[in-house]
Structure formats: structure tokens, C-alpha cells
Amino acid sequence: MGRFIFVSFGLLVVFLSLSGTAADCPSDWSSFRRYCYQVFQQKMNWEDAEKFCTQQHRGSHLVSFHSSEEVDFVVSKTLPILKANFVWMGLSNVWNECAKEWSDGTKLDYKAWSGQSDCITSKTTDNQWLSMDCSSKRYVVCKF
């Protein structure tokens, strides 16, 4: 009886220690570290893509990257499905928010940005980010 309790307790410890290592993702989502990812084969503009992601799962948004390993994981999921293409990332209007002053140090008190806002895409083949018109249609990767 004592041996059974010891073995049962040992299995419980192993289960509990492993339960926190991966995300608890829906069956059609892929997990990497503590996050869940889903590649969608629909093309949409950035705003619709972000809204779409928020409707897929609580806490879901367009993909964000925080390491080269995370990019490699997403590439491993997107490339077989989407081939060489682009997916939206959760970055937009970066140029409007970036520059707060001119290179000579004077305050940016006048702006003449074009009406076109820029959003950021990631290539499905490697870790390259590109600025594109937010109204263009690209594939979607959601993350939560």
C-alpha cells in the first residue's frame, strides 16, 4: 500500500511539473512555449485581420514576435501552408509613432504623412519584416 501511494505521488509530481510547460491550446491551434498560434488561409486588410483574430479566441491578436526561435516556429507553420508569402503582424502605424524629432534634434511640430498608413508584414520564409499599406490584403496568423 505504501509503495502504491509513493508511485501515485511520484506520478502526480511529474504531471504537475509538466503541465506548465506548454500552452493549453484548442485542438486546431499550435503551441509554442506558453502561446497558441493559428494560420488562416484567408487574405484581409490589417484592420479586418486584427478584428478577425480577436474573434477567434479570447486574448487572441495578430502575431507578435519576441525571439528568433518564435519566428522560426511560425515560419515552420506558415511556409508549408502559404508557401512564399506575407502575413500581417500586430504592428501598425509605426512611422507615425516613431519620429518625435528631426535628426537635428528639433521638435517634430509639423507632419505631412501620406494618407496611406503603414502596417508590418512578416515573410513566411524567414525573419524579414516589411512595411506595407494597411489596406492591402495579406494572410493572417493569430496568437494568444
UniProtKB/Swiss-Prot annotation:
Record-annotated disulphide pairs: 25-36, 53-142, 119-134
GO MF terms held by the record: toxin activity
Tissue: Expressed by the venom gland.
Keyword Nucleotide-binding listed: no
Statement: the UniProt record of this protein carries the keyword Ribonucleoprotein: no
InterPro entries for the chain: C-type_lectin-like (IPR001304), C-type_lectin-like/link_sf (IPR016186), C-type_lectin/snaclec_domain (IPR050111), C-type_lectin_CS (IPR018378), CTDL_fold (IPR016187)
Main location: secreted
Subcellular location: Secreted
The entry's keywords: Disulfide bond, Hemostasis impairing toxin, Platelet aggregation activating toxin, Secreted, Signal, Toxin
Source organism superkingdom: Eukaryota
Region forming the signal peptide: 1-23
GO cellular component: extracellular region
Domain C-type lectin residue range list: 32-143
Function comment: Snaclec that induces platelet aggregation in either human platelet rich plasma (PRP) or washed platelet suspensions. It causes aggregation in a dose-dependent manner even in the absence of various platelet agonists such as ADP or von Willebrand factor (vWF). Interestingly, it does not induce aggregation in rabbit PRP. A monoclonal antibody against the platelet GPIb receptor blocks the aggregation induced by trimecetin, suggesting that it acts by binding to GPIb (GP1BA/GP1BB).
Further comment found in the protein's record: Negative results: does not show affinity to coagulation factors IX and X in the presence of calcium ion. Also shows no inhibition on thrombin.
Family: Belongs to the snaclec family.
Quaternary data: Heterodimer of subunits alpha and beta; disulfide-linked.
Protein name: Snaclec trimecetin subunit beta
Source species taxonomy: Eukaryota, Metazoa, Chordata, Craniata, Vertebrata
